[in-house]
Amino acid sequence: MTKKTILVTGATGQQGGAVIDALMDLDKSGEKFSILAVTRKADSPAALDLVKRYPRVKLVEGNLDNVPALFESAKIIAGEHQLPIWGVFSVQVSMGPGVTFDGEVKQGKALIDGAIANGVQHFVYSSVERGGDARSWESSTPIPHFQTKKIIEDYLNATCGKQPGSRMDWTILRPVAFMDNLKPGMPTSLFLTALKNHLGEDRKSLQWIAVHDIGVFAAKVFDDPEKWNHTAVGLAGDELTMEQLSRAFSKATGYPMPLTYSLAGSLLTFVARELGLMIGWFASEGYKADIEARRRDHPGMLTMEQWLLTKSQFSTGADGAQIGA
C-alpha cells in the first residue's frame, strides 16, 4: 500500500482539525496517510498542541494568500519523506475580521490551481449545503458567504472536469449548520432566540451537523476516493424544530435551551445583516441534505443530543446549574 500525503488547510481550526482527528483515527498504525497540517504560525499554541497530540503530523507554515509558497514549503516537508502530495482538504474562512467576499473566492480558486499545478490526485472542498444535492449546483442563495462557496464549487467543476480521470479528481462536502457553533454564553442565546423568532416553535426545522462528522466524511473520501469521486453531497446528522432542539438540550444537559429576550434576537438579525439573511433563508427554504443516505455511509453520525452529551462545552453542575455560561 502506498502511503498518501494529505495537505490539510485550516489545520488548527474546527474543520481542518476534525479532518486530522478522523484521519489519525482511521490510520492508527500510520501506514495509510502522511499528514501535512497548514498553519499560519507553526509556533502558535494551537499548532504546538496539534503536534503534541499527533507527533506524526508535520506542520507547514503558510497561508492561502500565497498558495505557490505554501506548496513549496509543503513539498520540502513531504520530500523529506519522499512522498508526493496526493490529496488536499480545502476550507476557507468565510466570516470574521478581515475576511472579504473576493478574498475567500481568490483563496479557494488559487488552492485549486496550486493543487493541479503540483500534481495533486484528489481535492476535497468543504462548501455549504444550499437546498439539496441537485439544487445546490443551481442555487447560490441570498447569503454572501454561501455565494462564495458556489463560485468556488463551479470553478472546481469547470477547471478539473466533470468526469473521473480529468485534470484532478475532486469531492465536494456541503455541511449544514454546525452544532459546534453552539457554546455556553450570550452569543448562542442570541442566535437561538433569533432562530426561534424566524422558525417558530415547530413551524420549520433546521438541519445540523457535528464538525467531528465533517472530518469523518473527509477521511472516508481520502480512504476510498473512487467511491466519492466527482460527487457533491450535503452533510447533516440531525433535523430539528426549535421545540425538538429545546427537548434535546433538556435531555442532554438537564437545563433548557439557552434563550434571551425576543427583542434582542430581532435586534441581532437587524444589526448583523448577513446573519439575518441566513436565518431568513433557513425559514423560507433551508438545508435539505439527505440525512438517511449519509447515515448509511456513516452510521455513527451524531445527533444533536449525542453531540451535546459527548462533544459540546455544555454541562451541568450537581445542582443542575449551567457551567460556563
Indicate residue ranges for each PLM-predicted region.
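Short, amphipathic alpha-helical "lid/cap" segments that border enzyme active or binding sites
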Residues: 71, 105, 109-112, 211-219, ...
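Oxidoreductase cofactor-interface core, primarily capturing Rossmann-like NAD(P)-dependent enzymes
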Residues: 2-33, 38-48, 65-67, 96, ...
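Short beta-strand segments at enzyme active-site cores
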Residues: 90, 122-127
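A hydrophobic C-terminal alpha-helical subdomain
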Residues: 228, 261-325
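NAD(P)H-binding glycine-rich loop region in Rossmannoid oxidoreductase-like domains
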Residues: 34-118
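Eukaryotic N-terminal low-complexity, Ser/Thr- and Lys/Arg-rich leader segments
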Residues: 1-5, 25-32, 52-53, 80-81, ...
